[in-house]
Amino acid sequence: MRVAILVLLMVSFSPAGHALGGEDPEEIPTVVLEDILGTYSRSVQIAFERVSDIDSYEEAELALVDSWLVVTGIPIEEHRWTAAEPEDSEPVEHLRGSYIWTFEDSTKGLEQLRSSFLKGEIESFSPLLDRSVSTRFEPNDPFYDDQWHLNNTGQTSGTSGEDANVTAVWNSYNGSGVVISVIDDGVEHSHPDLTTNYLSQHSYDWCGDDPDPDPNSWDGHGTAVAGVAAGTGNNSIGVTGAAFGADIAGHRLIACGFTDSTAADALSYDNGDIDIYSNSWGPFDDGNRLEGPGPITVAAIEDSIYNGRSGLGNIYTWAAGNGLEANDNSNYDGYASLRYAIAVAAITHYGDQSWYSEPGANILVTAHSNGGTPDYEGITTTDITGTGGYSGGDVTHDFGGTSSATPLVSGVIALILESNPDLTWRDVQNILVHSSRKNDANDSSWSVNGGGLTVSHKYGFGAVDAGAA
């Protein structure tokens, strides 16, 4: 049950306020032509853009407001003599040039502020309102508390908050309406934590040439991947996925050898209905080979990029590779290095590089997986039921590699697409670039690129952050 809590929006003030009054000055207020808003951080600017949209408020609501947040270059001692004529002005401590203006007659505040704005006396004005908030959604799945990659509270001795920040958006989005294709060694679609989200009509077994991608009992990789991305949440069973409301298509491809033609078919299957193709596989990570997709596969992916999703383009996520100890580099992987692919590296519950995660210029983002001390702290996700897969039960606590980081990114993308289904494949990459968080901030691999963005060959543009996206 959501619990509604009424809180008062608090703004931090400096100790010295100013009561305004006195005789009228002989001259009009000193208008300072300065772009004060432009000196604020981009995040603060976006917040101002949101709250200053007066049309987004109800008229009756605004009529009761007696305190407003105002940005102006006019000296505080002259605020009283602006067209707005506030009764009082208080400077905001952390925002130079911002003030809280108070009006004795709340019904006239908006009209007077508009007049002041039109005269060029103020840059921005927005009402200070009481806000209602709710507690964050938390799934009732029994192993959710073990899923530190979704909500890191320090339960594995890692760094609290070092996670994908999906809980920040779960009250609004869970991936509903988005289809993730898991290209792997199969998906156990009868698994109680997967069956609800499984779409048989968009699935296929390329090894057996039939519509059922059910895996061999020893092939638990794809089932684990599916659980990380879109395991059913809040069903009192097992685990939850990052996008627990998204749909899953299963494609059994890597359980056998496959041709260029077969890979092309799998990676473009039903590209009008499938949104994301999640790929936790690639060439052997031995540091000795340069391999990539054949021409048929490249052509199929290009067609999906330009024509899939009704012309918006399909999204391809790809594991960057686990060969760091063999001095492998993700640049050697032609699949993960495709310009259309979102190459994903792995970090631990501390936010640093997992011991196996390959670096590369191709890496776009990083996401959480195993590899942290003291016990490598694996990812909790779905496993083949019974004695098959990685454990003797329906859940494994030891999944990992960039194989686990990749579906976590796929899940975050599903949340993004639910919020805006009209995003193109390039839009999605752009959002990830600008919303990812600089993890392991003191690492020497970070540098500023030609576009002024901070980037690393270990981490790409940083750790995915669903809340920021």
Cite the ranges covered by each PLM segment:
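Extracellular S/T/G-rich loop segment that most often corresponds to the catalytic His/Ser-adjacent loop
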Residues: 184, 333-418, 422, 464
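Structural recognition of the beta-strand scaffold that forms the well-ordered cores
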Residues: 44-47, 99-100, 124-127, 179-183, ...
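N-terminal domain-start motif of subtilase-like serine proteases
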Residues: 20, 28-35, 109-111, 143-182, ...
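Subtilisin-like peptidase catalytic core
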Residues: 158, 165-167, 178-180, 185-189, ...
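Protease zymogen maturation seam
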Residues: 20-24, 85-96, 117-179, 192-193, ...
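C-terminal subdomain of the subtilisin-like protease fold in secreted/lumenal serine endopeptidases
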Residues: 270, 274-280, 313-314, 341, ...
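Secretory targeting signatures
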Residues: 1-23
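Inhibitory N-terminal propeptides of secreted protease zymogens
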Residues: 22-139
